[in-house]
């Protein structure tokens, strides 16, 4: 892998996301967005990675990500998702959800739409109104789903002023993250270790399914769905463990993998190469997990060298559906094959790595050390 380039940006980065490429595009990712937190003024920023890796006049590598534009954001940026190539949805610690529009002609960002009281502990009409942080957002054009510390789930549509659907008491605990399973179904994770599946076709405020690790109430902070196999999801939480779940099978994780030494803040399957998975943590580490079957012959081990991990435990999930033509490598339960190569991607640990995103050969991450790291050659 080529060097991973750092840029110090004088703000703690809470979220970063690559701008999606047009369908069928052969380009590599060039533009990413960041959101900041815990600063006197927080910003949503757009960056270009430009002519990366060109030799500069001193013969060194130039890895300076260029700031295209930014805009002030009220409150900490709790989550960030591209809605399409021009619009970015931001979740705020104030409970507000904002859609920002990028104007490429003059490189500016403007507020396109806003739901100011999406999340709250006591209602906007109450004299004791108190907002609640919006903790997570997921987009599937034209829909935007948000979750919050108030245990509320909102379904918004772009260009609609009001929520299309709200599940007021979806959870008695904090909802930390949300992802789409299939179009009408979402999956949430909460602060008592539960995964809940919600079907927007059903009326009422009850989840269609609840999964959790028996006896374990460790808060879950992040979730991602396998891009090709929608029943496979990965979660991470306060104990740093990586859990792989098959939502068709029982209520327990299929695999539990010992991972980081502190909270896992984000987990992402690679969108086009999902045998590769990436995690980041409060402990200052950023890891690449490789579950591809050809690990011994792999030609692309990273500089720091990998370390192997074995599955800690399995539930009996290999009895049903084995006739599937493709069984995800993440669901393999053959002990002889249970080897996963883990590689640390950052040269040294510092403060918390809060966020990461991967697209094609490109990875970006952001830290509390006020740094953004980018590489364009993940697999070479």
Swiss-Prot record:
Subcellular location(s) per record: Chromosome, Centromere, Kinetochore; Nucleus, Nuclear pore complex
GO cellular component, one term: nuclear speck
GO BP, sorted A to Z: cell division; chromosome segregation; mRNA transport; nucleocytoplasmic transport; protein transport
Modified residues (N-acetylmethionine): 1
Family matches, as SUPFAM superfamilies: WD40 repeat-like
InterPro entries noted in UniProt: WD40/YVTN_repeat-like_dom_sf (IPR015943), WD40_repeat_CS (IPR019775), WD40_repeat_dom_sf (IPR036322), WD40_rpt (IPR001680)
WD repeats: 8-57, 72-110, 127-166, 170-208, 215-255, 259-299
Keywords associated with the record: Acetylation, Cell cycle, Cell division, Centromere, Chromosome, Chromosome partition, Kinetochore, Mitosis, mRNA transport, Nuclear pore complex, Nucleus, Protein transport, Repeat, Translocation, Transport, WD repeat
Main location: nucleus
Pfam families: WD40
PANTHER family per the UniProt record, alphabetical: NUCLEOPORIN NUP43
UniProt subunit comment: Component of the Nup107-160 subcomplex of the nuclear pore complex (NPC). The Nup107-160 subcomplex includes NUP160, NUP133, NUP107, NUP98, NUP85, NUP43, NUP37, SEH1 and SEC13.
Task of the protein: Component of the Nup107-160 subcomplex of the nuclear pore complex (NPC). The Nup107-160 subcomplex is required for the assembly of a functional NPC. The Nup107-160 subcomplex is also required for normal kinetochore microtubule attachment, mitotic progression and chromosome segregation.
Name of the protein in its database record: Nucleoporin Nup43
Source species: Homo sapiens (Human)
């Amino acid at each position: 892998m080529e060097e991973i380039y750092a840029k110090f940006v004088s703000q703690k980065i809470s979220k970063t996301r690559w701008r999606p490429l047009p369908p069928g595009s052969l380009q590599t990712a060039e533009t990413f967005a960041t959101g900041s937190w815990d600063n006197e003024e927080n910003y949503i920023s757009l960056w270009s990675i430009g002519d990366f890796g060109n030799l500069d006049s001193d013969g060194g590598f130039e890895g300076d990500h260029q700031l295209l534009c930014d805009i002030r954001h009220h409150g900490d940026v709790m989550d960030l998702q591209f809605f399409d190539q021009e619009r970015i949805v931001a979740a705020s610690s104030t409970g507000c959800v904002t859609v920002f529009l990028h104007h490429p002609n003059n490189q500016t960002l403007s507020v396109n739409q806003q739901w100011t009281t999406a999340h709250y502990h006591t209602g906007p009409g109450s004299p004791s109104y108190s907002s609640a942080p919006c903790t997570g957002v997921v987009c599937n054009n034209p829909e935007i789903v948000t979750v919050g510390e108030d245990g509320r789930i909102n379904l918004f549509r772009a260009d609609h002023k009001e929520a299309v659907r709200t599940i007021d008491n979806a959870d008695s605990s904090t909802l930390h993250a949300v992802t789409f399973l299939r179009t009408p179904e979402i999956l949430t994770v909460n602060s008592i270790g539960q995964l809940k599946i919600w079907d927007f076709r059903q009326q009422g405020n009850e989840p269609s399914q609840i999964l959790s690790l028996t006896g374990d109430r460790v808060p879950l902070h992040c979730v991602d769905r396998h891009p090709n196999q929608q029943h496979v999801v990965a979660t991470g939480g306060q104990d740093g463990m990586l859990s792989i779940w098959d939502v068709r099978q029982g209520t327990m994780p299929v695999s539990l993998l010992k991972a980081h030494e502190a909270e896992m803040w984000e987990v992402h399957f690679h969108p086009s190469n999902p045998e590769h998975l990436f995690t980041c943590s409060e402990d200052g580490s950023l890891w690449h997990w490789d579950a591809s079957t050809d690990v011994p012959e792999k030609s692309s081990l990273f500089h720091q060298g990998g370390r192997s991990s074995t599955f800690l435990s399995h539930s009996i999930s290999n009895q049903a559906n084995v006739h599937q033509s493709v069984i995800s490598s993440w669901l393999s339960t053959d002990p002889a094959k249970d080897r996963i190569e883990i590689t640390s991607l950052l040269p040294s640990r510092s403060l918390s790595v809060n966020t990461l995103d991967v697209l094609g050969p490109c990875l970006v991450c952001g830290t509390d050390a006020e740094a953004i790291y980018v590489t364009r050659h993940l697999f070479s």
